[in-house]
Amino acid sequence: MSIVLIIVIVVIFLICFLYLSNSNNKNDANKNNAFIDLNPLPLNATTATTTTAVATTTTNNNNSIVAFRQNNIQELQNFERWFKNNLSYSFSQKAEKVVNPNRNWNDNTVFDNLSPWTSVPDFGTVCHTLIGYCVRYNNTSDTLYQNPELAYNLINGLRIICSKLPDPPPHQQAPWGPVADWYHFTITMPEVFMNITIVLNETQHYDEAASLTRYWLGLYLPTAVNSMGWHRTAGNSMRMGVPYTYSQILRGYSLAQIRQEQGIQEILNTIAFPYVTQGNGLHVDSIYIDHIDVRAYGYLINSYFTFAYYTYYFGDEVINTVGLTRAIENVGSPEGVVVPGVMSRNGTLYSNVIGNFITYPLAVHSADYSKVLTKLSKTYYGSVVGVTNRLAYYESDPTNNIQAPLWTMARRIWNRRGRIINYNANTVSFESGIILQSLNGIMRIPSGTTSTQSFRPTIGQTAIAKTDTAGAILVYAKFAEMNNLQFKSCTLFYDHGMFQLYYNIGVEPNSLNNTNGRVIVLSRDTSVNTNDLSFEAQRINNNNSSEGTTFNGVVCHRVPITNINVPSLTVRSPNSSVELVEQIISFQTMYTATASACYKLNVEGHSDSLRAFRVNSDENIYVNVGNGVKALFNYPWVMVKENNKVSFMSANEDTTIPFSVIMNSFTSIGEPALQYSPSNCFVYGNGFKLNNSTFDLQFIFEIV
C-alpha cells in the first residue's frame, strides 16, 4: 500500500509541475501577442448549421501567426471550390481588370516601375495585377497554372501590402494620396485579399493568407457597407459585400448568420432590384439609375459580376434576374457598344464586358419613363437617350465636364461588322447628332462641388413608339447649362438605317459671337484605318458632294423635307484627329429657335427609299421608309406603323389618347380608312385609356 501511495503522490506532483509549466509558457506566449481562440464567435454564433471545425491560424496587429478555429469548414471549402471553378468566367464579366499580366515582381513595390505607396492609381494597378495573376495561377490552360514561384509572389505581395497599410485605418481619408481617393482601398484591395487566399487554398501559404484576410479586412472592411469611416451604398456596396462575406466565412460564421447582418441586408435590398419610380435602383421600365437621378450604367456594369456570388451565397431569389436582363437589353449589344448617354462620365461608347452578360435578342427595346430607345438588328446597333425632368441629362465631376453634348445628342447607328472605335480627347466632342455651338465643339458644364453634380433639363419631354422592327423617339429639350440650347428631335430606327430630324433649334440670343452652328452628321477618327478614304477625298470623287460619304460601315445622306430648310452636307476638320460631315445652321436662325437639320444613316451595302414630308404644320412630320414602316412625329404625339401594328405615345405621358389623334394620324400618313383594334387599352370617353401604365406608356393597336 505504501508503495502505491508513493506512486500516486509522485504522479500528482508531476501533473502539478506540468500544469504550472504550461501556464508559464502561456503567459510568455501572451507577452509575445500570441493566443489560442477556440471559440472566436459570439455566443449566438454557436447555432451555426455547419459545426465541423478545423484548426487554422490568424494574425495580430504585428502580422504574427496565431491559432484560429474554423467552425464551418464544409461551407468554406464549398465556396472556395466554386470560386475557383468560376473564376475565369467571373473575370470575363469584370470591367476593371488587368488581363494576362506579365509585370516583373519587386520586394518593395510588388511590381517594378510603380510607386504604389504614394500614387493611388499605381496602387490600383498593383491590386488589379495581383488579381490578374490569381486568374493565371488558377487557369489550367495557363503556363503559370499552380506555379510555386507565382504562389510565393502572390503571398509575398499580400504581405507587402499589409506592411504598408496604416493600423488602425484612417478615418474618412485614404491611407495615402488625395484625401478622398478611397476607391481602391475599399473596393479593389479587399478583392485582392479574397482572390489570393482562395487560389492558394491548396498550398502552404493558405493559412497565412487566410489570417491576413481576416485581420486586415476586419480593419478596412468592418462591415459590408463601411470602410475607413465612410458608409457606401448602391454599386460600391455590391462590390464590398463579396469579399466581406468571404472574410466572415473565414471567421467561422455561417452564410445564414452573415445574411442577417444589417450591412448585408442593405446590399440584399439593393440587389433585389425592386422596381422603383425614383432614386437609385432599377426603374419601372428597367433602366438602372445611380447617384439619385443619373442613368449610370457604369456602376451596374462594374458590379454585374458580383451577382453570381450573391446568388451562391444567399440563393437565386435574391436577384431580380428578369429586371436586370431587361436593363441590359435596353442599352447594350453583344459587341459591347453602348449608347454614351448611359455610360461613364469620361465619355465612352464601349464596355469590354457587357456583351458577356446576356444573350441579346434582335429586337427594339423602349424605356418609356426613363426615355431610352434601342434597336439591335442583324446589321446594326442604335440607341437614343431622351430627356425627362425626373432624371439628369448630364453628370459632371472635377475632371470630366465636356461630355454633355455627347450624352444628350448622340444620334447614330453602329455597324455590327465595323471596328469599335471609342472616343478619345480629340474625338469625344464630335459625334453624329451633336449640335455644335463653336468650331472646337467644347461645351463645359463644370461640377460645382468637389465630387459629382447632376443637371436636369429645363424642358424634358420625350415620347417613344415601337413595333417589331422599328422604333421612333420624339424629344423636346432645353438645357440651361448649355447656353439655353433647345430643340425638337425626331429619330426613327428601321431595317438597316436611321432617320434624324432636328427642328426649332435655338440658343440664347446673341450668344454665339455671330458664329454659325453645326449639326454633325458623320464623324471620322483619322487615327484609325478602316480602309475608307478621307471625307474630303470622297467628296472630290463624288463631284464635290458628300452624299453617300462612308466611314466604318456607315453611310450618310441628307434628307430633304418639303417646306423645311435642310442644309447641305459639308466637310470640315476641327483638328488633325477628326474629320466631319456637317450641316451648317445659321446663328440668326438659332437665335430665333427656327434652325433645322436632317439626315439619315445607313448600314453600308444597304439602301432604302425613305422620304420625309411636313404635313399641314411645322409640328407634323411624316416619314415613309417604304418597306411597310411609317412614322409620324406630331408633337406631343409620336406614332409608328409597321404592317398590321401601330403604336402611339405622348411626350406629356398621357394615359388616354383621343380618337381624333388616331384618326388625324392615319390621315397624315395617307391611310384615313384604317380600321384598328386596341391591344393594351380600352374605350374610355372620347378615346382609349391604357389598361396599365405602371411599366410603359405606349398605346398599341392591331390593324384589322
Curated annotation (Swiss-Prot):
UniProtKB keywords: Host cytoplasm, Host nucleus, Lyase, Membrane, Signal, Viral envelope protein, Virion
Q: Does the keyword Cell membrane apply?
A: no
Which residue numbers mark the site Transition state stabilizer? 345
**Gene Ontology molecular-function annotations:** lyase activity
Q: Where, subcellularly, is it found?
A: Virion membrane; Host nucleus; Host cytoplasm
Gene3D superfamilies, alphabetized: 2.60.40.4340, Baculovirus E66 occlusion-derived virus envelope protein, domain 2, Chondroitin AC/alginate lyase
Q: Which Pfam families match?
A: Baculo_E66, Lyase_8_N
One GO cellular component from the entry? host cell cytoplasm
What InterPro entries would the database entry show? Answer: Baculo_ODV-E66_core, Chondroitin_lyas, Lyase_8_alpha_N, ODV-E66_C_baculovirus
Q: What EC number(s) has UniProt assigned to this enzyme?
A: 4.2.2.-
Could you tell me the superkingdom of the organism this chain comes from? Viruses
Q: Does the keyword Signal apply?
A: yes
Question: May I ask which residue range the UniProt record assigns to the signal sequence?
Answer: 1-23
* Residues at the site labelled Important for catalytic activity: 395
Catalytic center residues:
236, 291, 299
UniProt lists the family membership as follows: Belongs to the baculoviridae E66 family.
Functional summary from the UniProt entry = Component of the polyhedra envelope. Plays an essential role in oral infectivity. May digest, with its chondroitin lyase activity, the chondroitin sulfate barrier of the peritrophic matrix of the host midgut to facilitate viral infection in the epithelial cells.
What is the protein name stated in its UniProt record? Non-sulfated chondroitin lyase E66
Species annotation: Autographa californica nuclear polyhedrosis virus (AcMNPV)
Q: Which gene encodes it?
A: P79
